């Protein structure tokens, strides 16, 4: 599932991670890193994808909770991609419109996602964070509040 597998995998991974090392200043440097793949929808909730969004919100809660509980040995962060790959039931036209409707007028590409991963790999003081790599889609999501329906 979107929640159970990451929960179990994080628990098992944490059992195997060595103790945190120390940097030159004597401060701990985590020896493990967990990256959960969320969805930018956790920043802009919509009832249109209720069960999926609830599962991803649970994973976001797990990310933050595990970041506290596994520190300082393991850092836990998340990436929230926007429209990156076309869904199997999604038309070319719909996917193109979805990407164009973001604030930046583009979706993300796999290289954008790996760049976000690279950031987390090289940022030892970052834990419990969500990096939305979505072309700003979470800022422009057409939810009822944006449409003036609530």
Feature-to-residue mapping (PLM):
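Short-chain dehydrogenase/reductase
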Residues: 10, 63-64, 114-117
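Conserved Rossmann-fold SDR core element
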Residues: 60, 70-84, 126-133
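A short alpha/beta connector and helix-capping loop motif
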Residues: 144-150
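Short alpha-helix in the Rossmann-fold core of NAD(P)-dependent oxidoreductases
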Residues: 1-6, 10, 47, 55, ...
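C-terminal substrate-recognition "lid" of short-chain dehydrogenase/reductases
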Residues: 110-133, 138-139
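Short beta-loop-alpha junction of Rossmann-like oxidoreductase domains
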Residues: 78-93, 142
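Catalytic loop of short-chain dehydrogenase/reductase
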Residues: 4, 15-71, 83, 137
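Catalytic Tyr-x(3-8)-Lys segment
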Residues: 93-112
């Amino acid at each position: 599932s979107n929640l159970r597998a990451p929960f179990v995998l994080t628990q098992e991974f944490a059992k195997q991670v060595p103790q945190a090392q120390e940097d030159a200043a004597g401060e701990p440097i985590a020896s493990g890193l967990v990256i959960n793949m969320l969805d930018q929808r956790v920043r802009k909730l919509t009832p249109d994808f209720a069960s999926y969004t609830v599962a991803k919100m649970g994973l976001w809660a797990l990310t933050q909770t595990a970041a506290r509980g596994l520190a300082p040995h393991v850092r836990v962060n998340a990436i929230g991609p926007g429209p990156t790959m076309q869904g199997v039931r999604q038309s070319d036209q719909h996917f193109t419109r979805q990407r164009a409707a973001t604030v930046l007028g583009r979706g993300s590409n796999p290289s954008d996602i790996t760049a976000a991963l690279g950031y987390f790999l090289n940022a030892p003081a970052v834990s419990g964070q969500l990096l939305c790599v979505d072309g700003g889609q979470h800022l422009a999501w057409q939810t009822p509040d944006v449409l003036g329906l609530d």
